[in-house]
């Protein structure tokens, strides 16, 4: 984990913030971001807990972002992690059901992979929409009590 946090810390030092046009649930939150994530799990990579309250069964995604002006705060958090200190991610999350953004030819991570791939050339700007659809996924989960029936979770 230390290697990954160290790499992120080095990259963050001079990583340029990019202007993103983003709406979540119809509200404009456009701005210059170093990082933003739409998450339904608590962590990315090796135990980087960006959304500690994210849950796969709550019917929402968690929006996490670090704006350009927040760079020093994120640097201090990563420094603390590298020093072995316990440090909670210092930015809040926002629950949402629908996100819209415009992708403008830069490479970004989508589900832990770079998009577009290195061999592909970025196309013209495209609108991307991420939406939570009720009951789109059915998860069978064993009950906490082994004597109880299994429960069905609708997402």
Positions of the model-derived regions?
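Long C-terminal subdomains/extensions of small-metabolite kinases
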Residues: 1-155
């Amino acid at each position: 984990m230390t290697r990954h946090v160290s790499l992120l810390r080095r990259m963050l030092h001079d990583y340029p913030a990019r202007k993103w046009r983003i709406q979540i649930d119809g509200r404009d939150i456009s701005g210059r971001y170093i990082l933003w994530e739409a998450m339904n799990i608590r962590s990315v990579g090796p135990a980087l807990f960006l959304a500690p309250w994210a849950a796969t069964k709550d019917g929402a995604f968690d929006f996490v972002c670090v704006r350009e002006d927040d760079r020093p705060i994120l640097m201090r958090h990563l420094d603390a992690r590298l020093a072995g200190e316990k440090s909670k991610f210092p930015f809040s999350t926002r629950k949402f059901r629908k996100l819209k953004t415009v992708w403008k030819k830069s490479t970004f991570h989508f589900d832990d992979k770079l998009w577009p791939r290195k061999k592909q050339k970025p196309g013209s700007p495209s609108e991307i929409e991420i939406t939570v659809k009720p009951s789109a996924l059915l998860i069978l989960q064993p009950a906490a009590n082994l004597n109880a029936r299994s429960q069905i979770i609708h997402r």
